[in-house]
Regions:
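Residue-level detector of Asp-centered blade-edge/turn motifs that repeat once per structural unit
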Residues: 22, 79-82, 119-121, 164-166, ...
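Hydrophobic beta-strand positions that form the internal "hydrophobic ladder"
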Residues: 26, 85, 124-125, 169, ...
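Blade-loop segments of beta-propeller domains
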Residues: 53-84, 89-92, 100-115
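A short beta-strand motif characteristic of beta-propeller blades
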Residues: 49-67, 102-108, 146-152, 193-199, ...
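Short loop/turn segments immediately following beta-strands, especially the blade-tip
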Residues: 38-45, 181-189, 229-235
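Bacterial Sec-dependent N-terminal signal peptides
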Residues: 1-23
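Repeated scaffold domains used in trafficking and secretory/extracellular systems
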Residues: 64-77, 110-119, 154-162, 200-211, ...
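Short, solvent-exposed loop/turn segments at conserved positions within beta-propeller repeat blades
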Residues: 87-90, 129-135
Length: 295
């Protein structure tokens, strides 16, 4: 028994390491800044920022990105197990940023970009809002910066989410929600094929978020709704019923955890609102726009 007893501390260490709960992180952006907080240890009086980056640090990009295209940030999606952050800006830029090195892995000029999503085959979908060159849904290849490989019209594009189970890309515009399939995706000339389109219950579509394999949350000027893909129906998202101008939303239907931002001063806010657990994270020096949860 003695040899076995010698290994017990090692077994315990390995077991505890395997079973340790990963820390929940919160990515937020506004103005020319993006930062990551440790969610559990952040309080209203002292948000615990563990990582940050600013457009001025993008020295590996053309100067116009640092001074114009990346100001202000309006999307900050953690992707690839949170090793990268997909950023968009209404100033006209998109960047895929490596978290560890803070190097740009992809960039493009996207007029009034408001959201983006990773797609199969190392491609990116971008929703562009109101701009003479915008109002569109664009597709890019990560290996080819600043080259649009497909484009469709989408008035006031604000959200894009890839639903893997359904093999559909959902896109949110001013007053409609669309579902696209991937066409000729393994070729050099990929396309999106519009499969379905639904009018949303209120104008001013803003955020689009996946909450399960079969459901999305849509936010707009007047309210937020859960969209059932199977039933093709919208139902009011009760935790935020009648809350106007929700700019970003994160929700776990299993735990009830809810994290969101809403416009409180023009289009921006100084607060991130959290429920289950309940707290308000306050940032008096930053005009915040969106926040995204990651593990």
């Amino acid at each position: 028994m003695k040899p076995l007893l010698l290994y017990l501390p090692l077994f315990a260490l390995l077991f505890s390491g395997c079973c340790a709960k990963s820390k929940q992180e919160l990515v937020a952006c506004g103005e020319d800044k993006v930062f990551i907080l440790d969610f559990e240890s952040s309080t209203e009086g002292q948000p615990n920022i563990i990582w940050s980056w600013a457009a001025s640090e993008a020295t590996d990009l053309p100067d116009v990105y640092r001074t114009k295209y990346l100001i202000p940030f309006d999307e900050c999606k953690p992707v690839d197990s949170s090793t990268k952050i997909l950023l968009t800006s209404s100033g006209g830029g998109i960047v895929l940023l490596d978290r560890a090195t803070k190097k740009s892995l992809f960039y493009a000029y996207c007029p009034m970009a408001h959201s983006a999503e990773m797609l199969p085959n190392n491609r990116i979908a971008v929703a562009n809002s109101t701009h003479p060159e915008g109002n569109s849904l664009e597709i890019y290849d990560i290996d080819t910066p600043e080259k649009v490989i497909f484009k469709d019209s989408l008035y006031s594009g604000h959200g894009v989410v890839w639903m893997y189970k359904h093999k559909l890309l959902f896109a949110l515009g001013f007053d409609d929600l669309r579902a696209y399939s991937l066409k000729n995706w393994d070729s050099d000339s990929p396309e999106l094929a519009l499969e379905r389109k639904w009018l949303i219950p209120s104008e001013g579509g803003h955020d689009l978020t996946r909450i399960s394999d079969n459901e999305l949350i849509v936010t707009a000027h007047e309210n937020s709704w859960v969209f059932s893909i199977a039933d093709e129906t919208f139902s009011v998202f009760e935790p935020l019923a009648n809350v106007h101008n929700v700019k970003s939303i994160n929700y776990n239907p299993l735990t009830g955890q809810l994290v969101y931002t809403k416009a409180e001063t023009n289009w921006w806010t100084n607060n991130i609102y959290c429920e289950n657990p309940e707290k308000v994270l306050h940032f008096p020096e930053i005009k915040l726009y969106k926040t995204r949860l990651s593990q």
